[in-house]
Amino acid sequence: MEAKLKHFTATAAFLITVLLLVGCAEENADTAFQVYLERLGRTLDLGSQTRVPHESVARPPRPGKLRLKIPADTLNTLDFMDLRGCELQVTIGKTNSSLGRLARDSQKLLLALEFLHLAPACIDYLTAAGELELAKKLDQARRQKLELLPSLIFNATLASEEFQAFWRPAPVSKEYPANTSSAVITALEHINQASARWLSGNYLADNQSFELQLSEVSGGDGGQLWRALLHQGQWLDSANAKLEQRGPLCTATRRPQSAEILPNVVRKYFIDGIQPRAAMLGRRYHQLLPPLFALEHQLRIKLPANYLGWSES
């Protein structure tokens, strides 16, 4: 009898502990969806078994696979020495140095913009000085740089390590996207606006600001947003499948009790439980990605096939 009493006491203590801990279960990004599907299953008499989705987010090709080939400059060292009297001489010297040849794509773009900004004045100077052949060669180099400008912008932005990091998938979190900021959005907007200026013939650039903007992009949440939207879509597809599996609740002669309960389930567990975060995800999408899509549109004639294949997947 004493043994049975001890067993009963231990069992009761265990059950009380479990009941006390039920409210302490940590909520995650799946919780609201699981509760909604379980309530749907009970209401529609379809069972409450749910399967947590395992979303797979495609990552863009690595920067080395995306980078567009940039031909070497047409101006050789002899031409560079002949440019005395032009501010452009310093820019060409930096470009042709060992550091210039090994520079990051962002620095190569900034040097090209500096070249395009300074070249017209140097061409005018050489022409006035009677150096017509050299002026002609410099103008040819300017035209080459101008033709390569979209490729240089692509290499420094969409094909860069910073944008690769932007698309890095992160675990789905219930705090997302409430825990984000507007800094990366501002950076993307500035990069897109600067690219538009450069492509329209205004080659001035704030080198430090551009590098800081790229750094901000690298900490952005493009991959996290993509995964969160995919995660949400898979859960809602499961909910829709349950509704389709059940079919119409009412007939001409019968209205079951579940027809009275279902609107309350949808209101409490979908409209109140899921929709607020879904709306936040929608807002984040429409704030974060439009400047990036606009940049892609500006560079569309230079986007390589592997980038297009990834972005359209």
Describe each model-derived feature in a short phrase.
Residues D139-L295:
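Extended amphipathic alpha-helical interaction segments
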Residues A10, P71-D73, L236:
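Short, intrinsically disordered, charge-biased short linear motifs at domain edges
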Residues R283-S313:
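Alpha-helical oligomerization segments
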Residues E27-N179:
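N-terminal Sec/ER secretory leader and immediately downstream segment
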Residues E2-A12:
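Bacterial N-terminal signal peptides that target proteins for export
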Residues A13-T17:
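Hydrophobic membrane-insertion alpha-helices, especially the h-region
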Residues L20-G23:
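C-terminal motif of bacterial Sec signal peptides marking the signal peptidase cleavage site
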